[in-house]
């Protein structure tokens, strides 16, 4: 099946109602159907391919991709696909400063690791019941917000965002730090300042699944390529 047909099947072409449109998205709109903007997939296909290729190249060069999707219908998909390809993710709430104040975030990640170790080795059980429950609640709270980035080990090389409106703070932080931004941009969104714009439906579960599967597959393929290059380098060194 062609990429265009896959996008049609996933409903990528359905935008928002005309009343909510952002005029800056005009060049990516094909027309209107029953008051809803239809996205021009002839524009989306090459832009999406460019974005997927960029993600693959970044990973092949040893880079990290941070997937961001905190809206209800994106949460489970973003988490599952990011885990499948071994990349960090934020799927519940974007903490202000998650990128721009990463040093502080890193301290919270260390705290989470310490508490998890205490739970695993039984240290928590030696505390009073009140202290134990407080620490368990802290673990749950930190895990929910930071669980997806606790293995990130530093700032990402790029972020992939589902819904540029919802995740505008994440985008602003990435831009401030010179981190490349890949984003699904619907007809009600502002495409300005996004490095890799993907005009498309950012609400439908089918569309979100389509994007995330393609990105995760690109990461997995690139990781295989990266490992093959490393193996060749090792062989050359031993020769």
Curated annotation (Swiss-Prot):
Keywords of this entry: Ribonucleoprotein, Ribosomal protein
The keyword Flavoprotein belongs to this UniProt entry's keyword annotation: no
InterPro entries found in the cross-reference section: Ribosomal_uS2 (IPR001865), Ribosomal_uS2_bac/mit/plastid (IPR005706), Ribosomal_uS2_CS (IPR018130), Ribosomal_uS2_flav_dom_sf (IPR023591)
GO molecular function: structural constituent of ribosome
Positions of disulphide bridges: none
UniProt xrefs under SUPFAM superfamilies: Ribosomal protein S2
GO cellular component: cytosolic small ribosomal subunit
Protein known as: Small ribosomal subunit protein uS2
């Amino acid at each position: 099946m062609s990429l265009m047909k896959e996008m049609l099947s996933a409903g990528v072409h359905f935008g928002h109602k005309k009343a909510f449109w952002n005029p800056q998205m005009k060049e990516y709109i094909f027309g209107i159907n029953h008051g809803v903007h239809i996205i021009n997939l002839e524009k989306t296909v090459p832009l999406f391919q460019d974005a997927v290729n960029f993600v693959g190249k970044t990973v092949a060069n040893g880079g990290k991709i941070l997937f961001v999707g905190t809206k209800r219908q994106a949460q489970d998909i973003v988490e599952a696909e990011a885990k499948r390809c071994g990349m960090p993710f934020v799927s519940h709430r974007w903490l202000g400063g998650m990128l721009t104040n990463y040093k502080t975030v890193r301290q919270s990640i260390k705290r989470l690791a310490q508490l998890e170790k205490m739970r695993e080795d039984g240290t928590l059980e030696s505390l009073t019941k009140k202290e134990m429950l407080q620490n368990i609640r802290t673990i749950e709270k930190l895990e929910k917000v930071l669980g997806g980035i606790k293995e990130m080990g530093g700032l990402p090389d790029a972020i992939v965002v589902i819904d540029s409106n919802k995740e505008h703070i994440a985008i602003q932080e990435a831009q401030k730090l010179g981190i490349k931004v890949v984003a699904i941009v619907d007809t009600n969104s502002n495409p300005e300042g996004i490095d890799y714009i993907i005009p498309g439906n950012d609400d439908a579960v089918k569309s979100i699944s389509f994007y995330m599967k393609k990105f995760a597959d690109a990461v997995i393929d690139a990781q295989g390529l990266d490992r093959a290059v490393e193996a060749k380098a090792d062989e050359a060194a031993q020769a």
